[in-house]
Amino acid sequence: MNTHFTAAVVGGGPAGLAAALALSAAGCDVLLAAPPHRAHGGAPDNRTAALFAGSIALLKNLDAWERIASHSAPITGIRIIDDTGGLLRAPELVFTAAEIDLDAFGWNVPNSALTAGLIEVAQRTGSRVRLHSTAGIVKAEIGASAVTLTTHEGATFTAGLVVGADGRGSLCRQAAGIGTRSWTYAQSAIATSFQHGRPHRNLSTEFHRPAGPFTTVPLKGLASSLVWVERPDEAQRLAALDEPAFRAVLEERLTGLLGPVGEITSRAVFPLSGLTAEAFGRNRVALVGEAGHVIPPIGAQGLNLGLRDAATLADCVADARAAEQDVGSAAVLDAYSARRRIDVTSRIATVDVLNRSLISALGPVHLARGLGLVALKTLGPLRRIAVREGLAPASADADLLHPDGARRLSERASGAARHSAA
């Protein structure tokens, strides 16, 4: 049994799965070490993720989207409603995908369908991706030419490059000696999904409220997912309500936009926090997803960032393979870290400023936010630039984020693109 791989991915969430498949597309033999996927049984995962166009392109390039699309709902418009109660109330603002010549901004995808679709592809890639079920990696030892991973069950594997996709408490990040900066907000989010009487018309609606955003995102049919940000004590109180009482409060907050509220799925409450790693790659370890950055669930940026990590890492590894370089070398990881820094830093800053502008008690802050929304409503070119940058930042230019990216990445890894240009 082979125990050495070009790359090993630790963690089986969507970002880790995408990283394993992306590295496979770049020509690597990949170990994916993750807990077993429970397609049946256990508590259902009712979470969803709004994925933008670049993330959908990545899934298409990985041959996963056709397995996921039927479970997902398009987001063709984004509506922002100022519900802060301030003296200057911004007008209702609606962005449409047609403004920037798209059919949809993105798709709202159930996490369970996303994970299952990616795993199905990984299982069909033959020997290129090897799935190893484990309760966890307990040790990662950095060597001169490889990293040795030890599983909870005692198995050992080596890899020239390890991808830490093991979450905010990442053992891989700690083993690589990468520090972090973290912070918390005096807020918690309630996450759930619900059925409703009126069509959502594929509009995502975000109420800007003093305690934080209250956001609905369309699901298939007469249903939407909800992320409701509140003060921690209020979030716990709301989550503890029985279903009829919670339904009544939810209908009040929605102001009739979606009609009567029907069945509500289980509610989860989690505190809002942020984290960013001081580097996204070092000592043969590359970080993807929440191992490298944690962002509040505002503006649907978190998982999209993680998928862009996976696509960018594949680019850097493909370049190394074409040049016959060590894929875990400092040069490769420095290049990856540099390419991800602008995107991650700008997303975190944007979400942080927006969130703090809502909960701030300072009048000038509310005035600035309101004037910004007015400008976006009245200035078409500015609005289109803002929307395009929010969905597909110029700094995120990896092959797999674009149509025909799988072919381009394969050529990059083989050096064909370089030879044809020479």
Positions of the model-derived regions?
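Conserved FAD-binding catalytic core of PHBH/FMO-like flavoproteins
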Residues: L59, A146-R267, L272
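C-terminal helical "tail/cap" subdomain of flavin- and related membrane-associated enzymes
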Residues: D315-A422
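N-terminal Rossmann-like FAD-binding beta1-loop-alpha1 element of flavoenzymes
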Residues: F5-L32
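FAD/FMN-dependent oxidoreductases across multiple families
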Residues: Q236-G328
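Conserved N-terminal helical subregion
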Residues: T3-H4, H71-A175, W183-S188, E243, ...
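Glycine-rich FAD pyrophosphate-binding loop
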Residues: S24-R47
